[in-house]
From Swiss-Prot:
The encoding gene: prmA
MF GO annotations: protein-lysine N-methyltransferase activity
InterPro entries cross-referenced by the UniProt entry: Ribosomal_L11_MeTrfase_PrmA, Ribosomal_PrmA_MeTrfase, SAM-dependent_MTases_sf
NCBIfam families tied to this protein: prmA
Major localization listed first in the record, in broad terms: cytoplasm
Protein family membership: Belongs to the methyltransferase superfamily. PrmA family.
Protein known as: Ribosomal protein L11 methyltransferase
């Protein structure tokens, strides 16, 4: 069977209704993306962890429906638009989807990733490239964080250089758990990973089991009281600014904090918010993204 992708862009208020209608009318799958992704207009969908998101699509959304090539896309989209209550049928484009061995193709796109001095992120279908490597076995999945994104890489390099044996670590916005797992493999003591997304929490638990890393995961309400030697948060600049007081309060006096998910042009603004609580500066920049690192002052 051959397939095509039907791609339409439309405002946020119509994206979810159109997606539901497309599925009801026979689309094989539907996804919604930020049409402004990787541009200055890109918007985070979620706000502060622990809060229920106020919206379920982006201001400028791209709806992508996978359809049978034998199906008339114009008829399908017109029917879906009518079902969703749209005043008119949105313009669309079609993309051909080639027949593929999807498992083999996916595996071929994820080779081992070398990070820092000794870290290797290795998919389960690969062997460790070096006998003395610090190996994290991680497959692509639902949760963010496989080591390929510059922000994840920056945080991993920072942790490799920073974590000392027995230190306590909080990974806030843990995604796949990659940073928490790395901290444990670097010799940390108690490690906690927190994420707003229950699917991410479950994925992180599974990844930790696979890597034999004893890490405690939970939702924001599960975050333990007390302070940590190290806090790392790889999120986005706006949530980081909102959570500055809370995140820095989790750092022991003299403890370390690292923040990423921050574009280089956003670094000064984020740093100025955190400077009220910690001595902080850009630690390293990579491909337009930065990792900010700081130390909590003795008096908070």
């Amino acid at each position: 069977m051959s397939y095509r992708e039907l791609v339409a862009e439309l405002p946020r208020e119509h994206a979810e209704a159109l997606s539901d209608a497309l599925v009801e009318l026979g689309a094989l799958s539907v996804s919604v993306e930020d049409a402004d992704a990787d541009t200055p207009d890109e918007q985070p969908l979620f706000g502060e962890p622990g809060l229920v998101p106020e919206r379920t699509a982006w201001q400028h959304s791209r709806v992508i429906a996978l359809v049978d090539a034998a199906q008339d896309p114009a008829v399908l989209l017109a029917a879906a638009a009518n079902e969703a209550g749209l005043a008119e049928t949105p313009r669309f484009e079609l993309r051909e989807v080639e027949e593929q061995d999807w498992v083999r193709l996916t595996q071929s796109q994820f080779d081992p990733i070398h990070i820092g001095e000794k870290i290797w992120v290795v998919p389960s279908w690969h062997d460790a490239p070096e006998p003395d490597a610090l190996v994290l076995e991680l497959d692509p999945g639902l949760a963010f964080g496989t080591g390929s994104h510059p922000t994840t890489r920056l945080c991993m390099e920072w942790l490799e250089q920073t974590v000392q044996p027995g230190q306590t670590v909080l990974d806030y916005g843990c995604g796949s758990g990659i940073l928490a797992i790395l901290a444990k493999k670097c010799g940390a003591g108690n490690v906690t990973g927190i994420d707003i997304d229950p699917q991410a929490v479950e994925a992180a638990r599974q990844n930790s089991e696979r890597n034999r890393a004893d890490v405690t995961y939970g939702l924001p309400d599960d975050c333990p009281a007390g302070e940590f030697d190290i806090v790392v948060a790889n999120i986005l600049s706006n949530p980081l600014k909102l959570m500055a007081s809370m995140l820095t309060s989790k750092v022991k006096p003299g403890g370390r904090i690292a923040l990423s998910g921050v574009l280089a042009r956003q670094a000064d603004e984020v740093a100025s918010v955190y400077a009220r609580y910690v001595d902080i500066a850009v630690w390293r920049e990579h491909e337009g993204w930065v990792c900010l690192a700081g130390t909590r002052r003795e008096s908070h």
